[in-house]
């Protein structure tokens, strides 16, 4: 049985979140949570929240045992980009791209 959780429009770039996602892909849930707890990046906090949501979904909706679950798949897609302007010297302006991501975690008991 598979259970899915998503966080859409997460305010962090997909490139940064993929570094964390690669660390826990395919691991058992307790080990993955341990890795995320000791990682001091903002992306680790975002991924941990989505993983905990997937665990809650599996326990509540499907009645699965949380300790037996494994991260079957985790992927990060690019979300929309907010464009902002930063004033510079001599009347010019630079563009700032505030990137977002869509985090998807799938846990399975197999």
UniProtKB/Swiss-Prot annotation:
Q: Could you give a single Gene Ontology term from the biological process aspect?
A: translation
> Keyword set for this entry?
Ribonucleoprotein, Ribosomal protein, RNA-binding, rRNA-binding
Q: Which residues form a coiled coil?
A: none
Question: What molecular functions are annotated in GO for this chain?
Answer: rRNA binding; structural constituent of ribosome
Q: Which GO terms describe its cellular component?
A: cytosolic large ribosomal subunit
One Pfam match: Ribosomal_L22
Q: Sorted alphabetically, which SUPFAM superfamilies does this protein's record hold?
A: Ribosomal protein L22 (SSF54843)
Record's function text: This protein binds specifically to 23S rRNA; its binding is stimulated by other ribosomal proteins, e.g. L4, L17, and L20. It is important during the early stages of 50S assembly. It makes multiple contacts with different domains of the 23S rRNA in the assembled 50S subunit and ribosome. The globular domain of the protein is located near the polypeptide exit tunnel on the outside of the subunit, while an extended beta-hairpin is found that lines the wall of the exit tunnel in the center of the 70S ribosome.
Oligomer and partners: Part of the 50S ribosomal subunit.
Give the family, as the similarity comment puts it: Belongs to the universal ribosomal protein uL22 family.
Q: What is this protein called?
A: Large ribosomal subunit protein uL22
Species this chain originates from: Buchnera aphidicola subsp. Schizaphis graminum (strain Sg)
The organism's lineage is: Bacteria, Pseudomonadati, Pseudomonadota, Gammaproteobacteria, Enterobacterales
